[in-house]
């Protein structure tokens, strides 16, 4: 029973790490958007297309990744019982992190356009 609890705690830590990293990245991107509007920097940061991309990725990381990863982490912390997590449960946080990284690649020049 303790082995299953450790597995669930490890999975919860991974999901919480993903959620926290997404929220931190979202905050940094928000800071970048705000800094681009400050008058001393505004004359140098005039790329409105980049600002739109940063805003889209900021919202995606903050809403999609954060609000998806946090409930999964809480579920793993609250789960109880003799059954272990599924065979592929350890792979899921890595797959979600790859998806979050794919969201961030939208910031690269020539890689997509905001809708």
Region spans (language model):
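Membrane-interface helix-loop-helix modules in multi-pass inner-membrane proteins
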Residues: 34-38, 53-115
